[in-house]
């Protein structure tokens, strides 16, 4: 995703998605992410050929074959057969849930660490896995709709709604304002609430409490998990909290990677959490897309940036500027905070496009045509 936000030529990222479709690795959740990756590729490129070519593969990646009558999935109840593994092109052994990495205790390989999953209890019906399942179904509904398959689009939408209903009735802890780790668990890891919040699964009347719980845990996840933690906070309009985590200087921070002497993002926050960490790892680069997509708020509203959505969430920043690439030309956004807390914005919208701007403080919405614009709140 960071590639799509920082470049206007997406060949490397597209090749990576195609490879992962045919050669998935072992975590359940990463296979479930495939429909989201394919959908985002379509939004950024405007090219639907990947969706058409891999449609049936993407359907299988939702793991609909693992659903029970409640719309919940599990890899640990006997439904994960060789045939199901073959349908998602998994040829190895040991397909299982991950939640976060590295894992600790009996579930993990890294015995030196307690793991980065905030004590998550690995239950048969796993909250995190089912949040991913819900998201995969939502993405498939959008993909089917984009391809004109309205019957499939409705079916996947209804399946997602059923999954959401079960999660919200069975796995919500009203007293703590958070989701439990799975069926039969009383533990609430940060992950069990940040993933449903990031994926839009949390009902409107629970968003504030869920966000407060997630925020109260700090950065209780790995750098991989940080992508979803910060997405969750931005989804809940907690932009100042997200900014503080992104700009943090503790052990779990991008600042710490620099302090260790690395010139490329690393696999883990620090060798304390993973002594054999990679010193060049793509998932460590989440901040690259979070700044563009969330802090500056620039995303494609229509495929190929035919229409651009700009919803800045600057937190307490005084000044920010970005030159965001797109296939139609660069999008420029400069924000300067005024003494009254409101912002002055300078924007450039490329030719053959238009933008929907939501102002950061007043939340007023404006439509911008190609060219330069100066906007005062």
What do these predicted regions represent?
Residues 3-7, 24, 28, 44, ...:
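Hydrophobic alpha-helical scaffolding
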Residues 21-25, 183-184, 212-220, 248-252:
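Solenoid-like repeat scaffolds
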Residues 1-7, 34-50, 132-150, 194-204, ...:
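Well-ordered alpha-helical scaffold segments within catalytic/enzyme domains
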């Amino acid at each position: 995703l960071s590639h799509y936000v920082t470049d206007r030529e997406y060949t490397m990222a597209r090749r990576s998605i195609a490879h992962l479709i045919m050669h998935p690795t072992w975590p359940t959740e990463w296979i479930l992410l495939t429909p989201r990756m394919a959908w985002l590729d379509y939004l950024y490129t405007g090219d639907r050929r990947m969706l058409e070519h891999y449609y049936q593969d993407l359907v299988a990646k939702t793991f609909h074959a693992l659903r029970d009558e409640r719309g919940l999935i599990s890899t640990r109840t006997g439904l994960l057969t060789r045939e199901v593994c073959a349908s998602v092109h998994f040829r190895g052994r040991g397909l299982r849930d991950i939640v976060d990495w590295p894992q600790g205790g009996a579930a993990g390989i890294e015995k030196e660490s307690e793991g980065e999953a905030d004590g998550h209890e690995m239950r048969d019906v796993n909250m995190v896995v089912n949040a991913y399942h819900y998201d995969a179904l939502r993405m498939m509904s959008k993909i089917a709709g984009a391809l004109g398959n309205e019957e499939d689009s409705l079916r996947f939408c209804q399946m997602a709604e059923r999954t959401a209903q079960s999660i919200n009735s069975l796995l919500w802890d009203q007293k703590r304002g958070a989701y439990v780790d799975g069926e039969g668990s009383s533990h609430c890891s940060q992950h069990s609430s940040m993933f449903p919040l990031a994926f839009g699964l949390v009902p409107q009347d629970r968003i504030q409490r869920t966000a407060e719980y997630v925020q109260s845990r700090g950065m209780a996840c790995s750098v991989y998990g940080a992508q979803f933690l910060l997405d969750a906070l931005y989804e809940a309009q907690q932009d100042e909290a997200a900014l503080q985590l992104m700009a943090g200087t503790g052990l779990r921070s991008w600042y710490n990677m620099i302090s260790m002497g690395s010139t490329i993002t690393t696999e883990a926050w620090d060798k304390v959490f993973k002594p054999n960490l990679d010193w060049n790892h793509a998932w460590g680069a989440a901040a690259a897309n979070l700044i563009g997509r969330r802090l500056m708020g620039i995303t494609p509203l229509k495929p190929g940036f035919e229409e651009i959505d700009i919803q800045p969430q600057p937190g307490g920043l005084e000044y920010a500027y970005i030159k965001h690439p797109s296939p139609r030309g660069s999008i420029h956004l400069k924000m300067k905070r005024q003494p009254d807390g409101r912002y002055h914005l300078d924007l450039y919208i490329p030719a053959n496009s238009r933008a929907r701007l939501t102002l950061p403080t007043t939340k007023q919405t404006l439509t911008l045509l190609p060219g330069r614009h100066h906007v005062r709140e």
